[in-house]
Amino acid sequence: MVTADETVLATTTNTTSMSVEPTDPRSAGESSSDSEPDTIEQLKAEQREVMADAANGSEVNGNQENGKEEAASADVEVIEIDDTEESTDPSPDGSDENGDAASTSVPIEEEARKKDEGASEVTVASSEIEQDDDGDVMEITEEPNGKSEDTANGTVTEEVLDEEEPEPSVNGTTEIATEKEPEDSSMPVEQNGKGVKRPVECIELDDDDDDEIQEISTPAPAKKAKIDDVKATSVPEEDNNEQAQKRLLDKLEEYVKEQKDQPSSKSRKVLDTLLGAINAQVQKEPLSVRKLILDKVLVLPNTISFPPSQVCDLLIEHDPEMPLTKVINRMFGEERPKLSDSEKRERAQLKQHNPVPNMTKLLVDIGQDLVQEATYCDIVHAKNLPEVPKNLETYKQVAAQLKPVWETLKRKNEPYKLKMHRCDVCGFQTESKLVMSTHKENLHFTGSKFQCTMCKETDTSEQRMKDHYFETHLVIAKSEEKESKYPCAICEEDFNFKGVREQHYKQCKKDYIRIRNIMMPKQDDHLYINRWLWERPQLDPSILQQQQQAALQQAQQKKQQQLLHQQQAAQAAAAAQLLRKQQLQQQQQQQQARLREQQQAAQFRQVAQLLQQQSAQAQRAQQNQGNVNHNTLIAAMQASLRRGGQQGNSLAVSQLLQKQMAALKSQQGAQQLQAAVNSMRSQNSQKTPTHRSSKLVTTPSHATVGSSSAPTFVCEICDASVQEKEKYLQHLQTTHKQMVGKVLQDMSQGAPLACSRCRDRFWTYEGLERHLVMSHGLVTADLLLKAQKKEDGGRCKTCGKNYAFNMLQHLVADHQVKLCSAEIMYSCDVCAFKCSSYQTLEAHLTSNHPKGDKKTSTPAKKDDCITLDD
């Protein structure tokens, strides 16, 4: 039987040698007092009792991962005791045949209890190093309080004797629970539940007694088989979580590399790739991956973000657990928060004019809050006011009401305001400390000396001041930059002369545009990573159908507009062709009238010559003969008139001829006959109707003279018909406010303004402007200015519609008239003065050539006209 001072127990799974090592060194008296035979007998008795207790109380748990538990009893085969060697250190030979390293146990000591109880706890520690052929190690430590510790594979198992279940292991390894052996009568009794602390003694015996011990302690074969099962289950426990993690990460890396190299996986998500790798690993090692997931070691992310760079923006791949629509429905139910009309308009404007409306709205709100804070601060503190308030009491009330609002805004805007840093030398202010530190590195010249920006040191030498910066402040000072004279607006290069800068700017601008075009990112560059991460979503069929219908409607509207424009163009072309035909007919009629006049003049000249010849012959015949046959003369004159084709004037001509014949009969002289011929010529010229009445449409300023009616004048501004020249002058003065101060005598010399294109003459400047636009498509500078002021009104000559303004726009849009600008040069008829404004010419005539001026000057030609420079 073992004494009460020794409670060292060692168990092994196979036949091994056991070395007992002391935890506390023995004294010399104890080692000399014990005898060898007594010690052997005590150990034998102790071994028999331990074997009986261990067979009933030892339990071995199975593999926790497979969910099976097995009970095994400890078996002791061989105990070898060596009493010739005592040592507190573990055996140096700690390796078996397989080379597995042995482990050393740590003695467990409990601290002393409370002093008022007056008892100390007995600490029993056992340290045992066991090695078998397979390298399994098991250490058991017993304590007086009924708990046993198993340190096999680094785990500790405790069992409480008061009907409590054993606690499970942390990492799921094998658990062994042993019951406390019955105390010997020679052991001290616990006092008040506390054990008495006593020293522990370990005894080592020689190897000579191994045979006797082996004969005594022969184990049962059944128990040996159960211990072998415990050994088999302890081998897979070495594959812990760390190794499983390493294997899983290695497999994930290999799988991702394989998927990355395949061209068909370019559009696959990163999260999908990771899930595929994990599924592949689950098929190979389901238990290890399951344990990693249960222990929350393997956690899949919901978001994978790529940081922004100079190539691409910030990209985030997100697989949310709950979509945003569900969150909104959970917060607000089926009814979403309704926006007011002003909020809807503001949101629509932001979406229309800004590519990122939400961020723009955030920045706008921050800016508005800052502006409101500054404004309310001025009102509350009565500073920077535009004017002095009239009623101070009302102003104080308003300021008192705005003060809490200002304080709220001030607290709200605190994150957006930074402290201003000021340079003591030059007064430069900035919110950035980095900018201020860079600014202070520059030398400051105050006009007469250099001033240090970090202290009060001054010096007149720039080099000494730089040395001061370096020696005192450890800063390499930089010279102050010179003020730019002629900098380039693009590259900020400075030039001494402006001309050199302009030449450089032209080339720099070309290079800048070319570089910008090269550096401009393309759509493929922006969407490269997006295409790799996820595919482009397919369009909804209904949305696609709506888009197609909208495209068809737009195409139809475009075709209709083109047809309408073509019809309008055809109508305008037909109207222009008709107008050209009318103009050609008028020109032909004018040419025919001129030919008739020329023929009449030739006929009258022939008649006059014939009359002169006949009169000369009559005189000679009168002198030679008394009577002359005058009938031949009358017949010749009538025949000549018939050849001319003038039937309307034959009566007047015949009357004149009869008078001439009567004069001839009365034997008047040749002078009277010549006078009659001249009078006939003048009367024919007066009574011959003018064919210029056909110019009524093109030259409205000319009067139409009928044979029995008064002359009619067509207004050159509004196309109104007016009888008599005096009424026409009154119409221009009252209706159009033109020719103010003019009298009827001023209109006797004809219209003063003439067109250089068609030689038509006009009374007013507005009539000339209207004629140039309608007939020739020329726009003067004054008319263009009127169009910009919405004052270009009037009557259209083409369609006859009246417009209060936008006449030029009507001509371009409706009649497809091509307008071009024209510069009118006005010249004075009296002197060589020329100008580009009609008002300037009027002022010149009024000041330099008044009506009462009798000075003779170069008369103005009848065909003087205004020159147009297109």
UniProtKB/Swiss-Prot annotation:
Subcellular location: Nucleus
PTM section of the record: Sumoylated.
CCHC-type zinc finger locations on the chain: 486-508
UniProt note on tissues of expression: Expressed in somatic cells of embryos, the head, hypodermis and tail of larvae and the germline of adults, including oocytes but not mature sperm and spermatocytes.
Gene Ontology process terms (BP): gonad development; gonadal mesoderm development; nematode larval development; oocyte development; positive regulation of gene expression; positive regulation of transcription by RNA polymerase II; regulation of gene expression; vulval development
Main location: nucleus
Keyword Repressor: yes
Biased composition (Basic and acidic residues): 41-51, 850-870
Keywords carried by this UniProt record: Developmental protein, Differentiation, Gonadal differentiation, Metal-binding, Nucleus, Repeat, Repressor, RNA-binding, Sexual differentiation, Ubl conjugation, Zinc, Zinc-finger
Phenotype on disruption: Worms exhibit temperature-dependent arrested elongation of gonadal arms. Mutants raised at 25 degrees C show reduced numbers of descendants of the gonadal precursors Z1 and Z4, while mutants raised at 15 degrees C show wild type gonadal development. Vulval defects are also temperature sensitive. Mutants grown at 20 degrees C showed protruding vulva (80%) and some had pseudovulvae (15%). At 15 degrees C, fewer mutants exhibited everted (36%) or additional small vulvae (7%).
Stretch list, region Disordered: 1-244, 673-708, 847-870
Compositional bias segments (type: Acidic residues): 77-99, 129-142, 203-214
Top-level taxon of the source organism: Eukaryota
Assigned GO CC terms: nucleus
Bias kind Polar residues: ranges: 9-20, 673-688, 695-708
One term of GO molecular function: histone deacetylase binding
Disulfide feature: none
Zinc finger map (C2H2-type): 421-444, 450-473, 713-736, 753-776, 794-815, 826-849
Subunit structure of this chain's protein: Interacts with hda-1, let-418, lin-1, mog-1, mog-4, mog-5, mog-6, pie-1 and unc-98.
Role, per record: Has a broad role in development, specifically in the genetic pathway SynMuvB that negatively regulates specification of the vulval cell fate. Required for fem-3 3'-UTR-mediated repression in the regulation of the sperm/oocyte switch. Acts by regulating the translation of fem-3 mRNA, by binding to its 3'-UTR.
UniProt-recorded name of the protein: MOG interacting and ectopic P-granules protein 1
Organism: Caenorhabditis elegans
Name of the gene: mep-1
